[in-house]
């Protein structure tokens, strides 16, 4: 089972902390559910509907256990842009940190946006502005390959469809300060982030989930150059250690990507 595999490769002290035990409980309850079947899940005081338990379990691990999005704010009403809000886990976390946060949530995939809207409202969160569009380098629409849970992408292999888009650069330019900008847009970051370069000076904290798709330029240096020129310090992490990388070129259990990184950037 997924929970047992996770425990066997994780330090035993995971069981000593409340958050660790909660994580293990999530793995036990939901980690081995059949893939891509809509399910109801529960953690803490929250109840959600998700299109795929496996993807959701890893979201929980990154957001609530690893706390990739935790940040300090000088105001109780931080401005947060959540690009790639998916089913709403990140927003629940942000609202737990800062209940009065002013959040704009962008989700490109229409079916996932329905989950997002329903999950926020069913958990009493009604003050988030949800934009059912892709963030992009223009507002003319962008072609996405269809996905099932969290993998719809401009590089997707599924049926292509034109998704309405909004130019993120223009959205950010309207704000005096953005306390936290989250970008998890399945490969589109290599186009979107450079387009935003001249407005990133108003961003205080930046999270980018970087994706490199097989057959496409990796372009990590393109992303990091933008981040460095904007004056950020940054830390890079991956949620998948790879043995024998000269042999194992692909991202494990993924036939379309060969690299995924979490980039956390902040003002020194």
Kindly give the residue locations of the regions a language model identified.
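Phosphate/nucleotide-binding beta-alpha loop and adjacent structural elements of enzyme active sites
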Residues: 1-268
């Amino acid at each position: 089972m997924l929970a047992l595999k996770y425990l066997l490769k994780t330090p035993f002290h995971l069981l000593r902390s409340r958050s660790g035990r909660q994580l293990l409980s999530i793995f036990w309850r939901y980690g081995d559910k059949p893939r891509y079947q809509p399910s109801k899940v529960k953690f803490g005081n929250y109840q959600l509907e998700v299109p795929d338990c496996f993807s959701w379990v890893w979201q929980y691990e990154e957001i609530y256990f690893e706390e990739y999005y935790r940040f300090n704010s000088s105001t109780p009403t931080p401005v947060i842009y959540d690009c790639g809000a998916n089913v709403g886990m990140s927003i629940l976390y942000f609202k737990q940190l800062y209940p009065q946060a002013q959040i704009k949530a962008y989700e490109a995939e229409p079916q996932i946006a329905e989950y997002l809207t329903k999950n926020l409202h069913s958990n009493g969160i009604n003050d988030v502005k949800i934009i059912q569009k892709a963030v992009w380098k223009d507002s003319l629409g962008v072609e996405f390959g269809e996905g099932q849970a969290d993998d719809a992408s401009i590089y997707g292999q599924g049926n292509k469809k034109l998704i309405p888009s909004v130019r993120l650069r223009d959205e950010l330019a309207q704000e005096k300060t953005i306390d936290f900008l989250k970008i998890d847009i399945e490969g589109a970051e290599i186009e979107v982030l450079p387009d935003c370069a001249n407005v990133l000076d108003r961003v205080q904290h930046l999270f980018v989930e970087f994706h490199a798709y097989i057959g496409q330029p990796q372009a990590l240096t393109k992303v990091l150059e933008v981040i460095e020129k904007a004056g950020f310090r940054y830390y890079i992490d991956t949620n998948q250690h790879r043995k024998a990388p000269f042999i194992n070129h692909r991202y494990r259990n993924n036939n379309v990507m060969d690299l995924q990184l979490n980039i956390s950037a902040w003002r020194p």
